């Protein structure tokens, strides 16, 4: 499954079913740029079980505020629309897999 780019309007629909890893990021954020290829690898390896959604906090401040995003990158694991895990900052692939696997 390809990584989905969400907006304030589409975020709820994109995260309402199954296990979703939501990446709150911004184009100017160095650690966000570092985590992008890690998310691509996760998508290739786990895309059949996991949906990855990216949301630009500069363009979608309403959703970032709703979820209390204060620092980026912030990664939320949602299961059927409910937040079950939160991670702030860059994490290696193995740490993200561990974060997600608990909820698959």
From Swiss-Prot:
GO molecular-function terms, A-Z: protein-disulfide reductase activity
Assigned protein family: Belongs to the thioredoxin family.
Keywords: Disulfide bond, Electron transport, Redox-active center, Transport
Species per Swiss-Prot/TrEMBL record: Bacillus subtilis (strain 168)
Domain Thioredoxin: 2-104
Main function: Participates in various redox reactions through the reversible oxidation of its active center dithiol to a disulfide and catalyzes dithiol-disulfide exchange reactions.
Cystines in this chain: 29-32
Name of this protein: Thioredoxin
One Gene Ontology term from the biological process aspect of the record: cell redox homeostasis
GO cellular component, one term: cytoplasm
């Amino acid at each position: 499954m390809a990584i989905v780019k969400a907006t304030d309007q589409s975020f709820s629909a994109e995260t309402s079913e199954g296990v979703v890893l939501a990446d709150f990021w911004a184009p100017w954020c160095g650690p966000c740029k570092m985590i992008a290829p890690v998310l691509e690898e996760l998508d290739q390896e786990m895309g059949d079980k996991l949906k990855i959604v990216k949301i630009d906090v500069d363009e979608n401040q309403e959703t970032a505020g709703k979820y209390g995003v204060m620092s980026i990158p912030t990664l939320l694991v949602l299961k059927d629309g409910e937040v079950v895990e939160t991670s702030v900052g860059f994490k290696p692939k193995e740490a993200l897999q561990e974060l997600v696997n608990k909820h698959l």
